[in-house]
From Swiss-Prot:
Biased composition annotated in UniProt, kind: Low complexity: 113-128
Bias-annotated ranges (Gly residues): 177-186
Membrane topology designation: Peripheral membrane protein
Region listing for Disordered, in residue ranges: 57-80, 98-191
A GO cellular-component term linked to this record: nucleus
Gene Ontology terms: biological process: protein localization to cilium
Protein name: Protein king tubby
Keyword Cytoplasm belongs to the record: yes
UniProt cross-references to Pfam families, sorted A to Z: Tub (PF01167)
Residues recorded with modification Phosphoserine: S136
Compartment(s) of residence: Cytoplasm; Nucleus; Cell projection, Cilium membrane; Cell projection, Rhabdomere
Alphabetical keyword list: Cell membrane, Cell projection, Cytoplasm, Membrane, Nucleus, Phosphoprotein
Source organism of the structure: Drosophila sechellia
Family: Belongs to the TUB family.
Amino acid sequence: MEAYIRQKRASPGMVQASDLQINRPMSGMRSNSRELHAYDGPMQFISSPQNPDQILTNGSPGGINSVAMNTSRNHSNNMRSLSTINQEADLIEEISSHELEDEESSPVTVIEQQQQSASHSANSTQSQKPRARQHSFSDNLDEDDYTNRNVAGAAPVRPAGMASSPYKDATLDGSSNGTGNGTGGESEGDVIGNIDQFVMQPAPQGVLYKCRITRDRKGMDRGLFPIYYLHLERDYGKKIFLLGGRKRKKSKTSNYIVSCDPTDLSRNADGFCGKLRSNVFGTSFTVFDNGNKESTESPRLDLAVIIYDTNILGFKGPRNMTVILPGMTEDDQRVKISSADPKQQGILDLWKMKNMDNIVELHNKTPVWNDETQSYVLNFHGRVTQASVKNFQLVHDSDPEYIVMQFGRTSEDVFTMDYRYPLCAMQAFAIALSSFDGKIACE
C-alpha cells in the first residue's frame, strides 16, 4: 500500500485541469457534458503544452534541458537589458557631469620631461595642435608674436617716472632659487584684516597668494549653474575661504555674482563684493565692484576687462586672452575708473581709444612649440596637473617672466589659482570665472 501511494504521488496526473464530475451525487447517469472548465487564471494552462507551471517527471530529461536552456536564455536577456540600462544611465550621468570644453579649442595636456632640471619641476602643460593666429591669418603661429607685438601704448604697472615694475626678480613658481615653491625672494600671502576688505586690496609687492577654486555641481540646478568657491591655501592642507561665485539664472548675458559670504550669493547680501558680466557672444567680460552705478558718493568702479580673441576661421589651438586692469598709483592703490560715470570713460573704452595712461594690459603667456611632442608647452611647475583649455598664465609684455596670475586644473572640479601684484583676489577670481563660461566664436 505504501509503495502504491508513493507511485500515485509521483505520477504527473494528480493535478486536475477542471472541476470534472464523473458521477452526479443524486444520479447514476454519466454525463460528460457537465464538465466545468471554470478556471480563467493561470490554471487554465495546466492542460496546455505551453504550461509555464508544468511539473516534469524524471523520465523526460529532454524537457528538463529545454526548460533549463529557456530559463538560461531568459536570464541572459534580462542581464543584457539591465546592463544596457546601466550603461545608458552611466552615459547620461557622464554627459551631464562632464565639463563642456570649447569645441574650437584644443585642450592643454601635461607632459613629463625626459631630463628634469634641478631648478625646475617636471610638470608642464601642452595643447595638441599648432594653429594660425586669427588676427594675422598666417599659416604658422609665430611664437614671438606676443613678444614682438607693438607695445608702445601698453602702460607699465607703475605710472611714468616711477621705479621699474615689480616684475623683475620674481617668477610665480619661485624658480629663481630652484625650489619651485614660490619662495624665490617673496613670501606666501595670508589674510590680513577683514575678508571683505582683503579681497579688494591689491596684493603687496613680493607676496604670492596660492589659492584653490572648487566647483560644486551637485543639486538640481548646479549642473548648469554651478557654484565656485575660492580658498587661500595654507600649510598642512589648511585653507581659508575668500570668495564664492555663482551664475545668475535670469539674465540675458552671462552674469556672475561674487560674495565673501558662502551662504548668501545674492546682490543684496552683506558680503556682496562685485559681479562679472559678459557681452552676448561671451568674448568680453567686465568686472565691477559692489558700488551703485546710480550713486555719486560711491559709484560702481571697473576692476578689470577680459577679452578673448574671436576664432573666425575655426582653427584649433590655445586660447588667446587680453586682460586690462586699472593702473596703480604711487602708494600701490588702483586708479579709480568708472564706466558708470558720464564724465569719464571706462576701462574698455580707454583701451579701444589706445589711451593707456591709467590702464595696464596683460596677455596670456604664449606656449612654446615642442617639435618632439608636437604640442605647445607651458611650465606650471607642479601647480597644474590635468589637461584643459582653461589653463593659462598672465604676463605683461614688458616682462614675460613675471607671471601675474596662473590658473589650471588639478582634478575634475578643482583648480589652482595663483596671483600677485597688482591683482587682488576679486580680480583674479573674476578672471578665472570668465574662463569657465561658455563662449561663442571664441578659441
